[in-house]
Design a protein with these regions (language model features):
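Mature catalytic core of soluble alpha/beta enzymes
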Residues: 1-146
């Protein structure tokens, strides 16, 4: 297991089972997770609006910019991508975040060897078809912090 920032690579298995990784609750208490994911020989990358941000006049400003609007992308709170290539997972987590939930999930479903989990701005959890059997929702994402 190798971790760098929001990216992680897991090789092989943990004994006789896959590695179990948590997906952070974007508005939950620090270090809380809302779901766990079982993976083996894969890269896991998450982009979100909850790490680097500030709030001004009640509006959240974060580091993932929508190039069409010139301001922070607003449709997602977090995007987790699973792929066999780290550079692909990292780029796609940010790109899907900017595309938004519907277009982002459509892209994920079209790409081979790519799966994803999206938490929308309304805390809806979208899961790609290839992860449905490997993802466990522990609790619904919450709004317990700004």
């Amino acid at each position: 297991m190798v971790q760098a920032g929001g990216d992680m690579y897991v090789a092989g298995r943990r004994g006789d089972r896959m590695w179990r990784l948590g997906i952070q609750n974007p508005r939950g208490p620090a270090d809380s997770i809302f779901a766990s994911l079982e993976l083996s020989d894969a890269t896991f990358s998450t982009s979100g609006d909850y790490e680097r941000f500030f709030i001004k006049d009640g509006r959240r400003y974060h580091h993932i910019i929508d190039p069409d609007l010139g301001e922070p992308a607003r449709g997602c709170r977090s995007v987790t991508i699973v792929s066999d290539r780290a550079i692909e997972a990292d780029g796609l987590s940010t790109g899907v975040f900017v595309l938004g939930p519907a277009k982002g999930m459509a892209l994920i479903e079209q790409l081979p060897q790519v799966e994803g989990v999206i938490v929308t701005a309304e805390n809806q959890v979208l899961v790609s078809s290839g992860l449905k059997d490997r993802l466990t929702i522990i609790s619904a994402p919450t709004d317990s912090r700004p």
